[in-house]
């Protein structure tokens, strides 16, 4: 398994910004959020598997970025168990389309291995669903994450999209080369850091709702 951890020193919303906006949605909240994104070998929860999780959490008053990547299908269960442990102190999960894909996918994989769901009792902020009312207001062509980032003027993505990453991962399983692994990890890093950037669009939602 490939494991990465690094502090996020810039390009992510500060604690007070995250606390302010999440506080508008959740009253019973102790501010232990986790931003996360997953990479899988396909969309089906039953015939494909999880191979990478990227997450951002708070440690020692610093945002830290974590990644766990399977080097073969047998490591999926280990990643699921590690992520479950990681979420023990978390009370809010922040994702993009996570309510419709990431969380249901993970729930199915946890069930497959007989592992209790780590999502029980935790709140979820799906930025895709939450920001959807802004599509017409901001005249967005689509609600995909890269489209939202482009609206914000963020055009610094350099890695392949999720679909291409599936092909890259299959190549990685054959070749085991570090360059391909870095390509996959880089895409996931951009997705997770993108969550922080899109999070700031909750400010537009306050204007939309007249809450300013």
Language-model-detected regions and their locations in the chain:
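Nucleic-acid-processing active sites and adjacent nucleic-acid-binding tracks
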Residues: 64-84
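N-terminal accessory regions of nucleic-acid-interacting proteins
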Residues: 1-30
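Two-metal-ion RNase H-like nuclease active-site motif
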Residues: 32-41, 188
């Amino acid at each position: 398994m490939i494991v990465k951890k690094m502090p996020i020193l810039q390009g992510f919303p500060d604690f007070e910004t995250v606390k302010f906006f999440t506080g508008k949605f959740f009253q019973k909240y102790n501010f232990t959020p986790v931003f996360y994104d997953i990479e899988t070998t396909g969309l089906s929860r039953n015939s494909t598997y999880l191979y990478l999780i990227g997450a951002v959490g708070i440690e020692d008053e610093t945002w830290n970025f974590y990644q766990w990547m399977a080097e073969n299908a047998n490591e999926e269960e280990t990643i699921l168990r590690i992520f479950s442990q990681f979420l023990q102190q978390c009370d809010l999960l922040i994702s993009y389309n996570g309510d419709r894909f990431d969380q249901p996918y993970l729930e199915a994989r946890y069930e497959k291995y007989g592992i209790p769901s780590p999502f029980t009792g935790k709140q979820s902020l799906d930025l895709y669903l939450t920001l959807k009312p802004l599509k017409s207001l901001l005249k967005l062509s689509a609600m995909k994450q890269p489209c939202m980032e482009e609206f914000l003027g963020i055009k610094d993505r350099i890695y392949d999209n999720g679909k291409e990453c599936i092909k890259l991962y299959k190549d990685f399983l054959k070749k085991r080369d570090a360059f391909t692994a870095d390509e996959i990890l880089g895409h996931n890093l951009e997705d997770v850091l993108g969550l922080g950037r899109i999070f700031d669009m909750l400010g537009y939602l306050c204007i939309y709702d007249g809450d300013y």
